């Protein structure tokens, strides 16, 4: 019964937010974020500790700003399927230089690995990619209950991307992703939190954590370009900054994967430090 209620809650949220006027929905979501800040529950406390790792002398209002940013992600994510192609394209911006580089790399036909932390609105970024006519594949954590996972998969497939389960699929996701890169398809992966317990240990904001090895392995094995993507919120859209990563070439594969993952961690840190309020990390990260 609990699982059914959770599934119903997500489904109702998706439907309700889509039909509400944006101004009304925004007020509701910001009020919910402020209530979460005042309640100071486990997620809020964890966000505070994570932000203190980044900004040791931070004002506590940064936590409130972080919760509001997270609420904005959910508000926008729920409403994405109702938007037109032109609205999806207008919802994300980047510099002309970054756009030209990305377009050129995709046109080369070797695929592109886009790795990013949990920042800004990654679903809006994915929708922007596929709205350009560039096929894209990603991996989704198998959430519980199963019905919620299926809703998230259906939601992202409706936006135009292929979604592979992190676990429980017919084939290992890395094998499928490597094939997709060889077909010239864009691979997008969240890369700041390891879910497999087999991640690479890296230095991150003065502490040690583990990050998934997948982006580095794919880039090294296939030769596909590797890009660290930084996303942040402006008043009207998501803004992207692309940082090209050159994979390590010296040593055994595990040595190169570790060094390349550290380069990604450094690039992630650079972006997060610029806008810590837009990093949606409400889980334990550091070892």
What are the roles of these predicted feature ranges?
Residues 1-116, 149, 153, 160:
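Membrane-anchoring hydrophobic helices of lipid-metabolizing enzymes
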Residues 8, 43, 94, 169, ...:
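Soluble or luminal CAZymes and related metallo-dependent hydrolases
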Residues 36, 54-60, 64, 104-106, ...:
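Non-catalytic C-terminal accessory region of glycerolipid acyltransferases
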Residues 45-46, 145-146, 209-212:
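Active-site metal-coordination segments of metallo-dependent hydrolases
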Residues 91-96, 118-119, 145, 167-171, ...:
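A conditional alpha-helix N-cap/helix-loop micro-motif detector
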Residues 97, 139-141, 166, 243-245, ...:
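Conserved beta-strand termini and adjacent loop/short-helix elements that scaffold enzyme active sites
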Residues 99-103, 126, 152-153, 177-178, ...:
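Short amphipathic alpha-helical segments and helix-helix/interface helices
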Residues 108-168, 197-200, 233:
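Catalytic core of membrane glycerolipid acyltransferases/transacylases, capturing the structured
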